[in-house]
Amino acid sequence: MATLYDYYKSKVITQLMHELNYSSVMQVPKIDKITLNMGVGGAASDKKILDNAILDLTAISGQKPLITKARKSVAGFKIRQGYPIGCKVTLRGQKKWHFFERLIIIAVPRIRDFRGLSSHSFDGQGNYSLGIREQIIFPEIDYDKIDRVRGLDITITTTAKSNHEARLLLSAFNFPFRK
């Protein structure tokens, strides 16, 4: 079975070298890492909520998440400095490619009322961020075993120098941008 990484090596690199007029393979942008972040609002009051979020993120990513803690106290949200408020995972190497393949082929088309992803979510330096409202779009999550529906943020960090280069890179993988 050919993976997305093999497709990148065989087709995407030559296509982008031609489109961007690069002379070296090393100039072609690539996906550096994928970061998944799940903020959990009620984690300060109930530890079980954070534990369930960690289990969900572990199932989705295939690796153990890092617990994120509050940087400073905010009285309005009833959190203090050092309280656990979420979890995150940084995917690199083969896990990055496996997750990216599952995201494009399986998960994103399962989003309710899906009409494509916004092309305005680039940050100016070639990185793309998207928010997912329901973790149940991933096939690893069993709908009957979750305690509540949670969202997560996905950031795709590339080595592209501009938004245009990053958009060409993601479009080469048939990333479903809105037309």
Curated annotation (Swiss-Prot):
Domain of life, per lineage:
Bacteria
What HAMAP family does the entry give?
Ribosomal_uL5_B (MF_01333_B)
Q: What Gene3D superfamilies does the record tag this protein with?
A: 3.30.1440.10
Q: Which GO terms describe its molecular function?
A: rRNA binding; structural constituent of ribosome; tRNA binding
The keyword tRNA-binding is annotated on this UniProt entry: yes
Tell me, which GO biological process terms does this entry list? translation
Protein name per UniProt: Large ribosomal subunit protein uL5
What is this protein for, i.e. what is its function? This is one of the proteins that bind and probably mediate the attachment of the 5S RNA into the large ribosomal subunit, where it forms part of the central protuberance. In the 70S ribosome it contacts protein S13 of the 30S subunit (bridge B1b), connecting the 2 subunits; this bridge is implicated in subunit movement. Contacts the P site tRNA; the 5S rRNA and some of its associated proteins might help stabilize positioning of ribosome-bound tRNAs.
What family is this?
Answer: Belongs to the universal ribosomal protein uL5 family.
Is Plastid set as a keyword in this record?
A: no
Where is it found, in Gene Ontology cellular component terms? Answer: ribonucleoprotein complex; ribosome
The record's note on quaternary structure and interaction partners says:
Part of the 50S ribosomal subunit; part of the 5S rRNA/L5/L18/L25 subcomplex. Contacts the 5S rRNA and the P site tRNA. Forms a bridge to the 30S subunit in the 70S ribosome.
Q: Keywords of this protein's UniProt record, alphabetized? A: Ribonucleoprotein, Ribosomal protein, RNA-binding, rRNA-binding, tRNA-binding
Pfam families referenced in this protein's UniProt entry, alphabetically: Ribosomal_L5 (PF00281), Ribosomal_L5_C (PF00673)
